[in-house]
């Protein structure tokens, strides 16, 4: 019987010698699951936010800090995991991160007050983001920029099941158990990913390139070099601001849909899943576009649609046109644009990073979740009487994404 190390060596040799255009199915599923840590950890418990507020007697704006603390943890944790993945390989940091994610999820299930839950959500994010960082680095290890954009689109298809299925699952869990059972389900998800990484995922860090880093100073130097690269920063911020608008929607939609428009908690997943289908469909159509267009040209057009959708959403919220059905239209358009923006911005940002792909992936994630934290907090702080705070933040994120791309990258192709 083959040992795990033998399987790893076999896949390493296979991946190095074959001109792969897509990863093996098991590899694709594991990477998709790792990249789904954020949507799973967020979307699964969204239907439970009102129940959490009721049990702890907390204001909805306070409960939303369980989201903000998660975003902060995702931003800070990635700058730790990235250099570790470049120095020690892709798999060891994954083992540690996934293990602590399981423990933090169990802790969330037994939290006795809202403050403890907020802190444990932070721990959950710091540990779980290892999967997100390293999954992106693994793709960069094996593919060029153009092919990477196609692979990221495939991964969005896999990870896109999370925002479709998770709210449904969370809502149905609430029909039979308390919100605490949702976090036990997350612990099982983390454990399954840990086993999958151990059993099937090969080590992919390039063996012919010296490991980067030698401590905090070396890591900071790498981050400084990356931030001085205008194109890297422009692509990272274009993707980051666009996804921050998506997180503003994730933060605000439970209150808007359930509390303001009276959608039952167990039906919330239908609306959330509808928008997620748009994101998945656009990410897959992106693969077809990339057969005869550059990732940069697709990204340019997607940025314009992001601005259009955000401003239309703001107008609908200000004027109060048509209630929830009309509000859903620009939200859907915005998420469709994310499906074009996210894979192409990521692929171009990581295109020439080589052995420091882990650090570059981490910095992208930190920038993305840093602005997502601000966007999420703004939705909570701007008030809860209408959809306007959510709409204003989404529109602002779309404009900032467009501005970052135009100012730092410009109009050329990658």
Question: What is the predicted role of each segment?
Answer:
Residues 55-57, 89, 110-116, 127, ...:
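Helix-breaking motifs and short loop linkers at transmembrane-helix boundaries and internal kinks
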Residues 76-115:
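Conserved MFS/SLC helix-loop-helix module at the cytosolic interface between two early adjacent transmembrane helices
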Residues 78-88, 282-297:
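Helix-to-loop junctions at the C-terminal end of transmembrane segments
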Residues 100-107, 115-123, 325-331:
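Paired small-residue
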Residues 116, 153-199:
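Helix-loop-helix hairpin linking two adjacent transmembrane segments in secondary transporters
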Residues 120-161:
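Cytoplasmic helix-loop-helix junction between adjacent transmembrane helices
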Residues 198-224:
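Flexible cytoplasmic inter-helical loops of multi-pass small-molecule transporters
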Residues 347-385, 393-394:
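A late C-terminal transmembrane helix in Major Facilitator Superfamily
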């Amino acid at each position: 019987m083959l040992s795990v190390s033998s399987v790893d060596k076999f896949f390493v040799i296979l991946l190095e010698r074959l001109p792969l255009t897509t990863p093996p199915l098991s590899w694709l599923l594991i990477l998709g699951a790792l990249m789904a840590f954020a949507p799973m950890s967020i979307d699964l418990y969204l239907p439970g936010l009102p129940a959490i507020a009721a049990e702890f007697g907390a204001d909805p704006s306070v409960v939303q800090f369980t989201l903000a603390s998660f975003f902060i943890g995702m931003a800070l944790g990635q700058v730790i995991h990235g250099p570790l993945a470049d120095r020690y390989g892709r798999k060891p940091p994954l083992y540690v991160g996934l293990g602590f994610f399981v423990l933090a999820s169990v802790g969330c299930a037994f939290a006795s007050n809202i403050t403890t839950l907020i802190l444990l959500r932070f721990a959950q994010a710091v540990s779980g983001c290892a999967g997100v960082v390293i999954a992106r680095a693994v793709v960069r290890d094996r593919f060029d920029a153009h092919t990477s954009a196609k692979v990221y689109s495939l991964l969005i298809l896999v990870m896109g099941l999370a925002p479709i299925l998770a709210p449904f699952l969370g809502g149905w869990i609430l029909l039979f158990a308390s919100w605490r059972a949702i976090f036990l389900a997350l612990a099982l998800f983390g454990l399954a990913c840990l086993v999958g990484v151990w059993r099937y995922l090969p080590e992919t860090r390039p063996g012919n390139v010296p490991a980067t880093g030698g401590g905090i100073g070396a890591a900071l130097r790498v981050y400084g070099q990356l931030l001085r690269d205008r194109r890297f920063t422009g692509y990272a911020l274009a993707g980051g601001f666009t996804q921050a608008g998506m997180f503003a929607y994730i933060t605000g939609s439970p209150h808007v849909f359930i509390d303001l428009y009276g959608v039952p908690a167990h039906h919330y997943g239908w609306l959330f899943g509808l928008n997620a289908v748009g994101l998945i469909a656009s990410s897959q159509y992106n693969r077809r576009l990339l057969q005869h267009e550059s990732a940069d040209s697709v990204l340019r057009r997607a940025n314009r649609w992001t601005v259009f959708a955000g401003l239309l959403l703001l107008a609908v919220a200000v004027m109060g046109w048509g209630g929830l059905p009309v509000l859903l239209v620009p939200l859907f358009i915005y998420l469709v644009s994310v499906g074009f923006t996210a894979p192409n911005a990521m692929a171009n940002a990581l295109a020439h990073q080589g052995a420091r792909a882990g650090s570059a992936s981490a910095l992208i994630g930190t920038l993305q979740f840093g602005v997502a934290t601000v966007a999420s907090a703004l939705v909570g702080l701007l008030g809860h009487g209408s959809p306007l705070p959510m709409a204003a933040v989404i529109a602002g994120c779309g404009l900032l994404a467009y501005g970052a791309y135009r100012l730092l990258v410009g109009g050329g192709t990658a």
